[in-house]
Amino acid sequence: MGVEQPLGDNIVTASLDGLVNWARKTSIWPMTFGLACCAIEMMATGAAKHDLDRFGIIFRASPRQADCIIIAGTVTKKMLPVIKTVYEQMPEPKWVIAMGACACSGGVFDTYSVVQGIDEALPVDVYVPGCPPRPEALLYGIMKLQDKIGKERNSFGSAIGLGDRLEPAA
């Protein structure tokens, strides 16, 4: 009895948000932007022992192919315009991970030439603290970003994925 299903179990029903978010969170392509010692730990995370490929994460060298940027290390005021330009070249939706104490809060460098946290210039989605953080910490941060992406609401009216995240004041 009940409604007959002519196609049987060959159809999966899901919301469009859930489907798009699943695709995005299981295929993050981060732009590598290593500025100091944290970059070594980021490279170790991509190596065989930790293997980011199993999470669908493939490092990209071009911002036009990336949907995430990992700021790893000390951000100087001279480097900040370059980071902003790279961020602007990334297609939407895009996410930012601040890796290491220097990227999160300036670290031990409380000086005029160091930006005291990349969140002064870019909207940071995940902070990975440590000096430098271990590869396991970056993996945990990436998994937190995947959780965040999975819960996002998409606006499919004008363009896919232009969320309601607040941008920092210029």
Curated annotation (Swiss-Prot):
Q: What is its EC number?
A: 7.1.1.-
Q: Which Pfam families match?
A: Oxidored_q6 (PF01058)
Gene Ontology biological-process entries:
aerobic respiration; electron transport coupled proton transport
Which molecular-function annotation in GO is an example for this chain? 4 iron, 4 sulfur cluster binding
Q: Where does it live in the cell? A: Cell inner membrane
**InterPro entries on file:** NADH_UbQ_OxRdtase-like_20kDa, NADH_UQ_OxRdtase_20Kd_su
Q: Keywords assigned by UniProt?
A: 4Fe-4S, Cell inner membrane, Cell membrane, Iron, Iron-sulfur, Membrane, Metal-binding, NAD, Quinone, Translocase, Transport, Ubiquinone
Q: Which reaction does it catalyse?
A: a quinone + NADH + 5 H(+)(in) = a quinol + NAD(+) + 4 H(+)(out)
- Record note on cofactor: Binds 1 [4Fe-4S] cluster.
A GO-annotated cellular component: respiratory chain complex I
Q: What disulfide bonds does the UniProt entry report for this chain?
A: none
Residue positions annotated to bind [4Fe-4S] cluster are C37, C38, C102, C131
Q: What does this protein do?
A: NDH-1 shuttles electrons from NADH, via FMN and iron-sulfur (Fe-S) centers, to quinones in the respiratory chain. The immediate electron acceptor for the enzyme in this species is believed to be ubiquinone. Couples the redox reaction to proton translocation (for every two electrons transferred, four hydrogen ions are translocated across the cytoplasmic membrane), and thus conserves the redox energy in a proton gradient.
The record's note on quaternary structure and interaction partners says: NDH-1 is composed of 14 different subunits. Subunits NuoB, C, D, E, F, and G constitute the peripheral sector of the complex.
The family line of this record is:
Belongs to the complex I 20 kDa subunit family.
Protein name from the UniProt record: NADH-quinone oxidoreductase subunit B
